[in-house]
A protein has these predicted regions:
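Conserved N-terminal/central alpha/beta ligand/cofactor-binding core
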Residues: 3-6, 29, 35-36, 40-122, ...
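Beta1/beta-strand and adjacent pyrophosphate-binding region of the FAD-binding site
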Residues: 6-20
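Core beta-strand elements of the Rossmann-like FAD/NAD(P) dinucleotide-binding domain
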Residues: 10-12, 133-143
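Short hydrophobic core segments
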Residues: 17, 139-148
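N-terminal Rossmann-fold NAD(P) dinucleotide-binding loop
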Residues: 23
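Mature extracytoplasmic enzyme cores
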Residues: 106, 140-144, 157
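Conserved beta-strand-loop-beta-strand element in the redox core of flavoprotein oxidoreductases
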Residues: 117-138
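Glycine-rich loop(s) and the adjacent beta-strand/alpha-helix scaffold that form part
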Residues: 146-189
């Protein structure tokens, strides 16, 4: 980290890296339980693959008599009411409001996590570079949630992690491949 550049320091209970739906739900759920949260996201809009940038609508597990509930259902109902034509700019606004209306969330958009500070084997701080302000954001927290989609905290911290698919017999998953491989982006089969 270049110390000649501006840095903004945050001290929170939970740092969530990644503002896709998983990161948003983690941040909102924690904030609603009184936890002080910093949400670092590397894009200008929330939602990850479900944002206007990628445009993968939220489908989830649902059928005739069942569907996703909780914060995802809250988003779905708000969208049904305010965005019946499913326009992505409105969708982005609904997601933006969800985060910004939570008083316990400090949102940090356009900020890519690129370094961490460890205390022994525990992450102490996450450091991100915000392109829009040309400054670093340093977030100290007790807990960290890696919802980045690319699992950036694991390699930065030296944690053990898997790349690819597990073999069929590792977890007794009948549709998994016979041998583990390095394929990504999809289901086990």
């Amino acid at each position: 980290m270049n110390t000649n550049l501006k840095s903004i320091y945050h001290k929170v209970d939970l740092c969530v890296v990644g503002g896709g739906l998983a990161g948003m739900c983690a941040a909102v759920a924690a904030a609603r339980h009184g936890i002080k949260v910093a949400l670092m996201h590397d894009r200008p809009v929330y939602g990850g693959n479900a944002s206007s940038e990628i445009r993968m609508w939220v489908c989830g597990a649902h059928g005739e008599n069942n569907r996703e509930t909780g914060i995802i259902e809250e988003i779905a109902l708000e969208t049904l009411y305010r965005n019946p034509y499913r326009r992505y700019p409105m969708w982005d606004a609904i997601l933006f409001e969800l985060i910004n209306n939570e008083k316990n969330i400090t949102p940090i958009l356009n900020c890519s996590c690129n370094d961490i500070e460890m205390d022994g084997s525990k992450i102490k701080k996450v450091i991100g570079w915000q392109t829009t302000t040309q400054c670093y954001h340093i977030i100290e927290a007790q807990l960290f949630a890696d919802c980045s989609g690319d699992s950036i905290l694991a390699p930065l911290s030296g944690a053990e992690y898997r790349w690819g698919r597990e073999s069929r017999n590792e977890f007794g998953e009948s549709i998994a491949p016979e041998q583990a491989d390095k394929k990504t982006m999809g289901l086990s089969c």
